Amino acid sequence: MPLLTESTRILLELGDRGFLGANLGRLARVLALSGHAETAAELVSRGEAMHAEIGVDPWLVTFNDETRALIRARLDEPAYAAACERGRALAPEAAVARALDTLESATNRTRAGTG
């Protein structure tokens, strides 16, 4: 996970929206699997909005579809729609901060035995 978080920070600094959007999708998958479905929905939606601006590789569409299925299994439709709307409205910097903060909190809870 440290490499993913560090590469996400670097991509943000470089302004590489294509790979940053892909990393947001990767972080969304991790968070969906660790019980943070609303944040995951925000991130995958922000990443997809970034890719809509520049185009996207086909493998990423499949990856994000699989991530959305994980998220939808954990959220009802109103919560999912609201999280997606919030995610699309996030600035890339805010999306990265949200992803990394949530991931750090989840990791700390796991280490402490409370998550």
Where are these regions (language model features)?
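Intrinsically disordered, low-complexity regions
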Residues: 1-115
